[in-house]
Curated annotation (Swiss-Prot):
It catalyses: urea + 2 H2O + H(+) = hydrogencarbonate + 2 NH4(+). It comes from the Eukaryota. Its EC number is 3.5.1.5. Signal peptide: none annotated. The gene is ure1. The active site is at H590 (proton donor). GO terms for biological process: urea catabolic process. This is Urease. The keyword Metal-binding applies. Pathway: Nitrogen metabolism; urea degradation; CO(2) and NH(3) from urea (urease route): step 1/1.
Length: 835
């Protein structure tokens, strides 16, 4: 079998699974519907009785809207399949595959030998659920029009194609440089281009005359490229010379008689805002629904320029001499530009181009050619050495950071990366009993080995050593060997003596201390543990307590200025299934036995509906600052991001708008609060926010691109150090990259170690220890971990006065009871995933 046949076999398996689900009355999600139709088309091709055209039609009537979830009607626009016909391999494209109400289940189940279910199993939903405004990722565009470059003068000009073939001219092409068979007054076109939307074109048919409007080029007004007729800086005094020369070369020129000229210039080109959003993505004051959540964001500002958007493609803007600068060295130009992205970050929700150089973000704003465009940002020059990632109608966030990782298996890295995580911070050595329970890499040999073994993986890595030692020599040795933090865990004994010793060493070496406190209350209650902190900064893991910690009141620590609190994701958010799964998780992770009553009591003491409910609200208030996974040790490494947004959705559902969003009709403040929980705040906490954690100039270019409809669930692309490390990719044998099956695959950027970072202690670098390991990743020291506090947690610095009833478990914050009901349905769930 060829590799492509294995990929098609995966498609067939999912298509077959979708058929079985359909036969028992399950309405299919987008992935299931796509796979069913695609795999059935493959089977029809195998019969050898149908042409490409036949199958393009047949694929449109298999499933009706009654057979799929309502959102599929708007999300499934086309399916592309390549299959082997009797005469070879050909592409079949199914446009609008869900375009009927009832479909044809005989076609959908052909060859499966499954019984055809009754249509009564698939009642239509309420009509409002099929409305576009209820679809995931819906963009609500402000009414009105957008004027393009309104301050520029317009010059109308008559143009006739004297050739025998059509001529199409793009928006930013220097009009004087156009085809020799276009006849017009070239003197009027000197230093000008078409007044049309960026990336569009005007087509001149043979013999046809059109009147078009021209506008002056901007920037340095340096003309390059084209036919080199007017090369150089625009100089009106050169017009006659340039026209004479081009006429000698055979280019047509027809001076316009003043009597034939229009009496006045035309008004600026106007684009309806809805069309603008389709072409370039939403702009200022447009609203976007995030995935299928109830969260709505408003674009606060657009840093691109209407009429000068940088657009790549055939006949579009980013071409030599137009949107791409000529004759500039690599040092002067971006390595990669991401164009027209909606950025969601703690710094704002806005639209901009993002410039990348040497793996770092060097510019955010307007990118392009300063020779011909105004307002090009510093360090934002697009040249022949610049690659382009088009992000129109996409969201860009910074790569997520999971700050609670048990490195139990290397496959976690692949799973985390595919969810949008680009930094994993924690400890472990593989599936040892110690690592299954704790995040500790406890000695130099294992630290060296873990740094080297993760060196080739496309993930930033930071390791934590074992901090449970009331002495200091081993703790120091672990930091000097490369650990970027120390972890205190109750399974190793989180006693006041160990806490004091660990924090003292962390203070000395400027690394973070992390703690899983004492559920047993063996040495002290929570008050004793807090006293042992001595007001020193510490990251308290799973501060609610189900993941471990003083029962029942570890959650009270969120009131203190030196506590940097986080949640782990099994309790995010509180649902009707949360409590029932926790006990078995806990027993496995912490090497407990159901045959030992004390083990069972220990486990049960950690699981409390009251504190989990309180955790929801404290996250929404910004009293708990971070969300992480606790990977394979009571947590899911691929769900940090999705469960963060589920928590935000549930809180909006039950608590309404936050005061800061009240009356705005959008959730910008809430979204900034939640995105900070897995980006900037864990980066600040662990001393790496000078390098990662936010979409800002100077940060390492770990960026995640999302389709609006898939936000929070499934990235379309992940960049590591400015290079694509993961993307949604079709059949590698396909004639185009969008042929089914589309899967998240690691790309070339995943195989360059220098696109990722190993975060280590400064001591391990200055001593030369890290250099001796021979790592290929970039190496960076953590810093400024000991002089921070809750006040530094962006959008998440609230410190309410906390109480917890030791018997009823009732939690209050600033005198208010923190209670909410569990939910039985959440977004970013069965609409997106197969299993």
């Amino acid at each position: 079998m060829q590799p492509r046949e294995l990929h098609k076999l995966t498609l067939h398996q999912l298509g077959s699974l979708a058929q079985k689900r359909l036969c028992r009355g399950v309405k299919l999600n987008k992935l299931e519907a796509t796979s069913l139709i695609a795999s059935q088309i493959q089977e029809y091709v195998r019969d050898g009785n149908h042409s490409v055209a036949d199958l393009m039609s047949l694929g449109k009537d298999m499933l009706g809207k009654r057979h799929v979830q309502p959102n599929v009607v708007h999300l499934l626009h086309e399916i592309m399949i390549e299959a082997t016909f009797p005469d070879g391999t050909y592409l079949i494209t199914i446009h609008d595959p869900i375009c009927t109400t009832d479909g044809n289940l005989e076609h959908a189940l052909y060859g499966s030998f499954l019984p055809t279910p009754s249509q009564e199993l698939f009642p239509l939903e309420e009509e409002k659920l099929y409305a576009p405004e209820n679809s995931p990722g819906f963009v609500e565009v402000l009414e009105g029009e957008i004027e393009l470059l309104p301050n520029l003068p317009r010059t109308p000009i008559e143009v006739r194609n004297m050739g025998d073939r059509p001529i199409q001219v793009g928006s930013h092409y220097h009009f004087i440089e156009t085809n020799e068979k276009l006849c017009f007054d070239r003197s009027k076109a000197y230093g000008k281009r078409l007044d049309i939307p960026s990336g569009t074109a005007i087509r001149f048919e043979p013999g046809v005359m059109k009147i078009v409007n021209l506008i002056p080029i901007g920037g340095a007004k340096l003309i390059q490229g084209g036919n080199s007729l007017s090369k150089g800086v625009f100089d009106d005094s050169r017009t006659r010379e340039i026209v004479d020369n081009l006429m000698k070369q055979g280019f047509m020129h027809q001076p316009e008689s003043p009597l034939n000229m229009p009496l006045q210039s035309a008004r600026p080109f106007v684009v309806p805002r809805k069309l603008y959003a389709v072409m370039y993505g939403p702009t200022t004051n447009d609203k976007i629904r995030l995935g299928d959540t109830n969260l709505i964001v408003r674009v606060e500002k657009d840093f691109t320029e209407y009429g000068n958007e940088s657009v790549f493609g055939g006949g579009k803007v980013i071409r030599d001499g137009t949107g791409q600068s000529s004759s500039k060295s690599m040092d002067e130009c971006l390595d990669t530009v991401i164009t027209n992205a909606v950025i969601i970050d703690h710094t704002g929700i806005y639209k901009a181009d993002i410039g990348i150089k040497n793996g770092y973000i060097v510019g955010i704003g307007k990118a392009g050619n300063p020779d011909t465009m105004d307002n090009i940002g510093e360090n934002m020059v697009i040249g022949s050495s610049t690659d382009v990632i088009s992000a129109e109608n996409k969201i860009v966030t910074y790569g997520g950071m999971d700050s609670h990782v048990h490195f139990i298996c290397p496959q976690q890295i692949e799973e985390a990366l595919a969810s949008g995580i680009t930094t994993m911070y924690g400890g472990g050595t593989g599936p040892s009993t110690g690592t299954n329970a704790t995040t500790c890499t406890p000695n130099k040999d294992l630290i060296r080995s873990m740094l080297r073994s993760t060196d080739s993986y496309p993930m930033n890595i930071g390791l934590t050593g074992k901090g449970n030692d009331s002495g200091s020599s081993s703790l120091k040795e672990q930091i000097e060997a490369g650990c970027s933090g120390l972890k205190l865990h109750e399974d190793w004994g989180s006693t006041p003596a160990a806490i004091d010793s660990c924090l003292s060493v962390c203070d000395e070496y400027d690394v973070q201390c992390l703690i899983h406190t004492d559920t047993l209350n063996e040495s002290s209650f929570v008050e004793g543990t807090f006293k042992a902190f001595k007001n020193r900064t510490i990251h308290t893991y799973h501060v609610e307590g189900a993941g471990g910690g003083h029962a029942p009141d570890i959650i009270s620590l969120v009131q203190n200025p030196n506590i940097l609190p986080s949640s782990t994701n099994p309790t995010r958010p509180f649902t009707t299934n949360t409590l029932d799964e926790e006990l078995d998780m806990l027993m496995v992770c912490h090497h407990l036995s159901r045959n030992v009553p004390e083990d069972v009591a220990f486990a049960e003491s950690r699981i409390r509906a009251e504190t989990i409910a309180a955790e929801d609200i404290l996250q929404d208030l910004g009293a708990i600052s971070m969300i992480s996974s606790d990977s394979q040790a009571m947590g899911r490494c691929g769900e940090v991001i999705s469960r963060t947004w589920k928590t935000a959705h549930k809180n909006k559902l039950q608590r309404g708008a936050l005061p800061e969003d009240e009356g705005s009709g959008v959730d910008n403040f809430r979204v900034k609060r939640y995105v900070s929980k897995y980006t900037i705040n864990p980066a600040i906490t662990h001393g790496i926010s000078h390098i990662v954690g936010s979409v800002e100039i100077g940060k390492f270019a770990d960026l995640v691109l999302w389709d609006f409809a898939d936000f929070g669930a499934r990235p379309s692309m992940v960049l590591k150090g400015g290079m694509i490390a993961l993307a949604s990719m079709g059949d590698p044998n396909g004639s185009i990259p969008t042929v089914s099956p589309l899967m998240s695959w690691q790309m070339f950027g995943a195989h360059d170690p220098e696109r990722s970072i190993a975060f280590v202690s400064k001591a391990s670098i200055t001593s030369g220890v890290i250099e001796s390991y021979g790592l290929h990743k970039r190496v960076e020291a953590v810093k400024s971990t000991r002089n921070i506090g809750k006040k530094d947690m962006v959008y998440n610095s609230y410190m309410p006065k906390m109480t917890v009833d030791p018997e009823a478990y009732t939690v209050t914050a600033d005198g208010k009871v923190m209670e909410c009901e569990p939910v039985d349905k959440l977004p970013l769930s069965q609409s997106y995933f197969i299993f």
